[in-house]
């Protein structure tokens, strides 16, 4: 079966594993998924991410993060720009998620960035997802 939106698939796998409080999950790897996972790690939404070589496309193993009382760190994920309806934001229109409590992930000419990084670099791009 052909996967039409691999980023949405990754976000759905994270959302599903998070809902049942799994410790880790695996997704087929790609460069953009790897960069999104690194942003989630850097922003404190996941504990760790590792790349596993399997002589094909590779696998990303994502370790989810929970609070001291087993509460979820990721409360929501939403795919914004989809293959059927792309959503772009200019440099001065980069969205804020929950007044800065969450992050927006953008694909820009300078790589995959968070909304804060895009504002600092004064660049716009395709709004991939919101995470809060």
UniProtKB/Swiss-Prot annotation:
A GO CC term assigned to this protein in UniProt: ribonucleoprotein complex
Transmembrane spans: none
Organism annotation: Anoxybacillus flavithermus (strain DSM 21510 / WK1)
Described purpose of this protein according to its UniProt entry: One of the primary rRNA binding proteins, it binds directly to 16S rRNA central domain where it helps coordinate assembly of the platform of the 30S subunit.
Gene3D superfamilies hit by this protein: 3.30.1370.30, 3.30.1490.10
Keyword Nucleus included in the entry's annotation: no
Keywords tagged on the record: Ribonucleoprotein, Ribosomal protein, RNA-binding, rRNA-binding
GO terms, biological process: translation
Family, similarity comment: Belongs to the universal ribosomal protein uS8 family.
Name assigned to this protein: Small ribosomal subunit protein uS8
Source domain of life: Bacteria
Oligomer and partners: Part of the 30S ribosomal subunit. Contacts proteins S5 and S12.
Molecular-function GO terms, alphabetical: rRNA binding; structural constituent of ribosome
């Amino acid at each position: 079966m052909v996967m039409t939106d691999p980023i949405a698939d990754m976000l759905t796998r994270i959302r599903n594993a998070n809902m049942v409080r799994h410790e880790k999950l695996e997704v087929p790897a790609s460069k953009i998924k790897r960069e999104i996972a690194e942003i989630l790690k850097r922003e404190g939404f996941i504990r760790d991410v590792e790349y596993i070589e399997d002589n094909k496309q590779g696998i990303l193993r994502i370790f989810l993060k929970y609070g001291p009382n087993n509460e979820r760190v990721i409360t929501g994920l939403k795919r914004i720009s989809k293959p059927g309806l792309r959503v772009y934001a200019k440099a001065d229109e980069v969205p804020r998620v929950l007044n800065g409590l969450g992050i927006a992930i953008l694909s820009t000419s300078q790589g995959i960035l968070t909304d804060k990084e895009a504002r600092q670099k004064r660049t716009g791009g395709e709004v991939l997802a919101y995470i809060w």
